[in-house]
Amino acid sequence: MLTLDTLNTMLAVSEEGMVEEMILALLASPQLVIFFEKFPRLKNAVTADLPRWREALRSRLKDARVPPELTEEVMCYQQSQLLSTPQFIVQLPQILALLHRLHSPYAAQAKQLTESNSTFTPALHTLFLQRWRLSLVVQATTLNQQLLEEEREQLLSDVQERMTLSGQLEPTLAENDNAAGRLWDMSTGQLKRGDYQLIVKYGEFLAAQPELMQLAEQLGRSREAKSVPKKDAPMETFRTLVREPATVPEQVDGIQQGDDILRLLPPELAALGITELEYEFYRRLVEKQLLTYRLHGEAWREKVTERPVVHQDVDEQPRGPFIVCVDTSGSMGGFNEQCAKAFCLALMRVALADNRRCFIMLFSTDVVRYELSGPEGIEQAIRFLSQRFRGGTDIASCFRAIIERMQGREWFDADAVVISDFIAQRLPDDVVSKVGELQRLHQHRFHAVAMSAHGKPGIMRIFDHIWRFDTGMRSRLLRRWRR
């Protein structure tokens, strides 16, 4: 069967103009205009999606099949082009019958042309074919427009669903244009309103706990940029004036031990006049232990040093992926559970803004994994937020899972974050040793987010940084009072 792409090529019908016209009409639709005004960050993300839309529309037109009736009419037209005028006159009754049987829009006009002219001349033959081709072009264009209109309705429906999802999650997850673009890319999944409302709920909880959001910002961006000299930088001479004691005495500055007879203190001279103390005086003189006045002055001199030239590169500390381990034991239930989930949502926000990965592991008796920054990040986040914290505590398994994950090449600069109340058994020596090796040799950093003031110091000593967010009633009331 004839494809629409082949038909367009045969009749020299250009679909590019129709595709561009449809895209412009879609962007000018009232739904998108209102959406762009409300969420300007997402406008760039939608605009960046236009090449994919164009390619999808071209692919749809290319693969579309032409109806059998139109295919048969086009084949008849092509065969008729090869006939001479006498041959065409012989075939004309069959051609008219075919057009009538196919209910061609050109059938009535073709019949009128033949009946209104008693003699079928070569000029009439050319006119017949030209008008027939024009009718076929109109039919092909109409077919293109029908398919594009169907695609426009489907595309508009999909875009509206994604706009609804992205618009709901934008205040929670989109911090900048980069995050808005990644959020738009993740909105392609089949999600219902009740699903993503869970993210909105925890986003509202996070907004009500600004200290928790601030803590996530500080942890996520705790690696500052630093300046380092360029490699093989030339040396330059650097001169400074330094002040140092001079050899010329100017004033009494204190008392010291020595053998300077001219600066002896009066008590030392008095000892020389006593016979019993005379030998003691000479002993102390030889050993330079006599008390004397200390006299000296000050002088300035030029100190010459060499250092690399001051031109420096700004070497930003690497911001690698997050590997977040969340304690799902029973002691982490209730308000602790809400805070832990909201904190992970805040880290997801930081990861989207900084183009980083965010990998979540839940540990109790088993380890469950979610990646919140992948193409299915929203679905993964919903599954994570739907979990309940009712297990036991096996923090050693958590660390072993982190260590195993960090062996991968794509995780060489990852930061580990452990969220727990740290009321657990001590870590095995092999785990402590391996964590120390990762910190020392590979510069991996381990962060602890302590949800309780009663965490065991022996466990928390292993971390590079400890971020405290006490969820006790007293601390919660104090935070509310300060706000």
Curated annotation (Swiss-Prot):
Main location: cytoplasm
Localisation per UniProt entry: Cytoplasm
Highest taxon above the source species: Bacteria
SMART domains: VWA
Keyword flag Iron: no
Keyword terms of this UniProt record: Chaperone, Cytoplasm
SS bonds (residue pairs): none
CC per GO annotation: cytosol
UniProt-listed CDD domains: VWA_YIEM_type (cd01462)
Gene3D superfamilies, alphabetized: von Willebrand factor, type A domain
Keyword Chaperone recorded: yes
Biological role stated in the UniProt entry: Component of the RavA-ViaA chaperone complex, which may act on the membrane to optimize the function of some of the respiratory chains. ViaA stimulates the ATPase activity of RavA.
PANTHER family on file: PROTEIN VIAA
Family: Belongs to the ViaA family.
Subunit note: Homodimer. Interacts with RavA.
Protein name, as recorded: Regulatory protein ViaA
